[in-house]
Amino acid sequence: MQLGVNVDHVATLRNLRSTAYPDVVRIASKAVECGADFITVHLREDRRHIRDGDVFALKKHLAVPLNLEMAATREMLEIAKKVAPRYVCLVPEKREEITTESGVDAKGMFEILAPVVSDLRQSGIGVTLFIEPEKEQVDYAKKLCADKVELHVGAYCLSKSQGELERIANAAAYSHEQGMECHAGHGIDYGTAATIATIRHVSALNVGHFLICESLLHGVGSAVRNMKKIILEQRHNA
């Protein structure tokens, strides 16, 4: 099982004082050194944390794949084609939200998403759709020719309900049946990571805010190593 580390909130801290530190590339590189299999960043339209220069610098210096989260807009598409990350993850975006509140509606936004997915894939960039854990959303992700789906697991991480966990497990199994790799992300901490890691067809977890918070107490290396240890042990014992 793989671990993706999202470093958006390293940039949030930097931007609060308009300083050059903390350095997003240095923190990302430390995360990789300590077990991160790929690095994720969300380049939002309002540039509230990650900025264009961060994305280009990460692509240049990282020894692991870069996963670029972005809205399905013309501006972001052109940036992605210039950066050429290994993967782009298409997400919904609202200016007033604190963080991404839900998955992208692959059915309702089909006509908007289709040309963006096609253009990215023709440019040699793999495409992931960040979706709710629902079979219909998986179906439309497949119709859009997405390479992967990432399940929005925020509802489970907040509620810890068995019903939400079953939704994730069912959507992951269905994604596998449809031939699409399945990741999970949003709101994950050590406890929820341990549980989600037992779901056979979830192949990677994306974790950001929690790991950055843990890093303030224990350091980046310790936080990332602990998370990687937990998910690998849970997967092995599942």
From Swiss-Prot:
**What EC number(s) does its UniProt record assign?**
2.6.99.2
Function, as annotated, reads: Catalyzes the complicated ring closure reaction between the two acyclic compounds 1-deoxy-D-xylulose-5-phosphate (DXP) and 3-amino-2-oxopropyl phosphate (1-amino-acetone-3-phosphate or AAP) to form pyridoxine 5'-phosphate (PNP) and inorganic phosphate.
Task: Please give the start and end residues of each transmembrane region.
Answer: none
This protein's source sits in the domain of life called Bacteria
Quaternary assembly = Homooctamer; tetramer of dimers.
Reactions listed under catalytic activity: 3-amino-2-oxopropyl phosphate + 1-deoxy-D-xylulose 5-phosphate = pyridoxine 5'-phosphate + phosphate + 2 H2O + H(+)
* Cysteine disulfide partners in this protein: none
Active-site positions on this chain? 42 (proton acceptor), 69 (proton acceptor), 186 (proton donor)
Question: What are the recorded GO MF terms, alphabetically?
Answer: pyridoxine 5'-phosphate synthase activity
Per its UniProt entry, what is the enzyme's top EC class, as one word? Answer: transferase
Which named protein is this? Pyridoxine 5'-phosphate synthase
The encoding gene is pdxJ
Q: Which NCBIfam families match?
A: pdxJ, PRK05265.1-3, PRK05265.1-5
Q: Which InterPro entries match?
A: Aldolase_TIM, PyrdxlP_synth_PdxJ, Pyridoxine-5'_phos_synth
Q: Does the keyword Hydrolase apply?
A: no
